[in-house]
Swiss-Prot record:
Gene for this chain: pheS
Protein name in UniProt: Phenylalanine--tRNA ligase alpha subunit
Assembly and interaction partners: Tetramer of two alpha and two beta subunits.
Organism from which the protein derives: Syntrophobacter fumaroxidans (strain DSM 10017 / MPOB)
Subcellular location: Cytoplasm
Keyword Aminoacyl-tRNA synthetase found: yes
GO terms, biological process: phenylalanyl-tRNA aminoacylation
Amino acid sequence: MEDAVRKLLNSADHEVLALANDARAIEQLKVRFLGRKGELARLFKEMGKVPEAERPAVGKVLNEAKVRLEALFAEALERGGEQGAGRREQIDITVPGRRPPRGRLHPISQVAREVCRIFNWLGFEIVEGPEVELDYYNFEALNIPRDHPARDMQDTFYVSDDVVLRTHTSPLQVRTMEKRRPPIRVIAPGKTYRCDSDVTHTPMFHQVEGLMVGKDISFGDLKGILTIFVHQMFGADVGLRFRPSFFPFTEPSAEVDIQCVMCKGEGCRVCSQTGWLEILGSGMVDPEVFRMVGYDPEEVTGFAFGMGIERITMLKYGIDDLRLFFENDFRFLRQF
């Protein structure tokens, strides 16, 4: 019996050593040696064949073998578990990595940057200002006094009697001219707010305001700058026209239309069969605005223009619903 026990222990030692750090295989080996129907249990069953006088000694040998086997497998399982976990945590730096998905700029951000790039190229500097604006800068300094009918044209978010969420980026015209002397050539991109929400309007939208002031600035300069912008943004083959309009802070004023990008000027549902689409408003700075900032309208002239970035983006990419920009739908955003 002692020889059988010795062989059993030697076999267990060798097989555990051969399996090294394979915890699952060691667990299976433990069942084979220590399980209810295992090798050691078979030897215990043979105790009945051992002479009664020898049974105490044989029983002691078998119990010692059981303790030794339990210790052997416990140590092997602990070692195998630790080293197996270590292997799982190791990183093979020679294996090619998985490239994470790249983010993209929102289409409005892309177009806003493109607009700024074009005007930077034309020599315009970017200026910024507060979105929560004083009524004075948003209206009065732009030739829109409290009793002016033009105030009815804009649905305004009022923070208090004299503070509003700016309805346009035009206040940057006044703020810039208050701080600087001509010549001035700036654009002011930013968010604006109005109480309006439908397929073509949202309560928050983006605008870019432009201002150029100096000696002998003419409407011809305005037309030249905006013609270059349109051709850079939409292509050199896109026609444009200047249509008389009204804005309280410019005189004369004009809307700028481009040939419909959908039908190439032939007439379609998007352009209401006219072949033209409005993209921005513009005009020569009203002398009264110059006086509000301390400029002499007899010495300087200038022009201003303003455009909605959402409008430009919709025309550039053929988008027919403004609300798509704010729904965070990956199916839409991944196209840009």
